[in-house]
């Protein structure tokens, strides 16, 4: 292989369509646009969602829902995640360092998903009733 012999793979490059250059080209006369109508004219396109003056679908349907402003700042952590951690004390900083929650997270909650087989102390995190029971059953505790 030499630099002067490099060429694109077969079929990776396509020739530009040259329209309106005679009948023999297959794209002459109307140039693939059909006959008459708005879409055959130059500049003859409408914006996305335009329905010819009829009230468009996106305006006929009601607005729904909202974007939560707190979503980026709260997180959930499972018992399964905590089981994988080496730390005996788990707080928000430990979770961030382990990559279990994002850097922007201000508060996290432990939820009961998976099992916990060792003693763990949870500091400064919320916990569901099921998670709290599982942590205490394993000999751990939750500190505010």
Curated annotation (Swiss-Prot):
Residue ranges with Gly residues bias: 21-31
Gene3D superfamilies attached to this UniProt entry: 3.100.10.10
RNA-binding in keyword set: yes
Ranges for region Disordered: 1-48
Single GO term (MF): structural constituent of ribosome
Record keywords, A-Z: Ribonucleoprotein, Ribosomal protein, RNA-binding, rRNA-binding
Claim: Repressor is one of the keywords in the record: no
Pfam families assigned to the protein according to its UniProt record, in alphabetical order: Ribosomal_L27A
Cystine residue pairs: none
Any Gene Ontology CC annotation: cytosolic large ribosomal subunit
One GO term (biological process): translation
Recorded family membership: Belongs to the universal ribosomal protein uL15 family.
Subunit-level organization: Part of the 50S ribosomal subunit.
Xref: PANTHER family: 50S RIBOSOMAL PROTEIN L15, LARGE RIBOSOMAL SUBUNIT PROTEIN UL15M
Role according to the record: Binds to the 23S rRNA.
NCBIfam families per the UniProt record, alphabetical: rplO_bact (TIGR01071)
Protein name from the UniProt record: Large ribosomal subunit protein uL15
Organism field: Cupriavidus metallidurans (strain ATCC 43123 / DSM 2839 / NBRC 102507 / CH34) (Ralstonia metallidurans)
Classification of source organism: Bacteria, Pseudomonadati, Pseudomonadota, Betaproteobacteria, Burkholderiales
């Amino acid at each position: 292989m030499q630099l002067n012999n490099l060429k694109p793979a077969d079929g990776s490059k396509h020739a530009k369509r040259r329209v309106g250059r005679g009948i023999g080209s297959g794209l002459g006369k109307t140039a693939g646009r059909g006959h008459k109508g708005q879409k055959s004219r130059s500049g003859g396109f409408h914006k996305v969602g335009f329905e010819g003056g009829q009230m468009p679908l996106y305006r006929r349907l009601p607005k729904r829902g909202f974007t939560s402003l707190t979503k980026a700042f709260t997180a959930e952590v499972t018992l399964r995640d905590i089981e994988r951690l080496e730390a005996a004390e788990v707080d928000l900083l430990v979770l961030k360092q382990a990559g279990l929650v994002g850097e922007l997270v201000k508060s996290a909650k432990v939820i009961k998903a998976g099992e916990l087989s060792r003693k763990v102390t949870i500091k400064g995190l919320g916990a569901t009733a099921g998670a709290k029971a599982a942590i205490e059953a394993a000999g751990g505790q939750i500190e505010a």
